[in-house]
């Protein structure tokens, strides 16, 4: 679970960014210097691997997303579960998602 928690804010990554120093922070935690190692940040790029992993956990734990994932007759489309998007804590995601 440690791999999905931002060390800058101690929440699930929100728009995770890979930094020039090698660390990963949320976009909201981004400053001139890295909050983890204090190095000056010269570049930051979206970390699609971490984002995809977090998204897969949400799908795995949300009954609405499970139904969409298992529905082979429907066209694949992009949709979002507002409750999933509003949580910043994996414990909340896993406990709430069976009820919506």
Curated annotation (Swiss-Prot):
**Highest taxon listed in the record's lineage:** Eukaryota
Q: Which SUPFAM superfamilies match?
A: RING/U-box (SSF57850)
Identification of the protein by name: Uncharacterized protein DDB_G0291640
Name its species.
Dictyostelium discoideum
């Amino acid at each position: 679970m440690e791999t999905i928690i931002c060390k800058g804010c101690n929440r699930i990554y929100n728009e995770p960014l890979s930094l020039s120093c090698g660390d990963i922070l949320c976009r909201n935690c981004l400053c001139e210097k890295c909050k983890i190692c204090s190095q000056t940040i010269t570049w930051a790029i979206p970390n699609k691997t971490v984002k995809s992993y977090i998204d897969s956990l949400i799908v795995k734990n949300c009954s609405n997303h499970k139904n969409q994932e298992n529905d082979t007759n429907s066209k694949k489309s992009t949709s979002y579960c507002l409750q999933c998007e509003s949580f910043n804590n994996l414990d909340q995601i896993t406990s709430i998602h069976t009820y919506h």
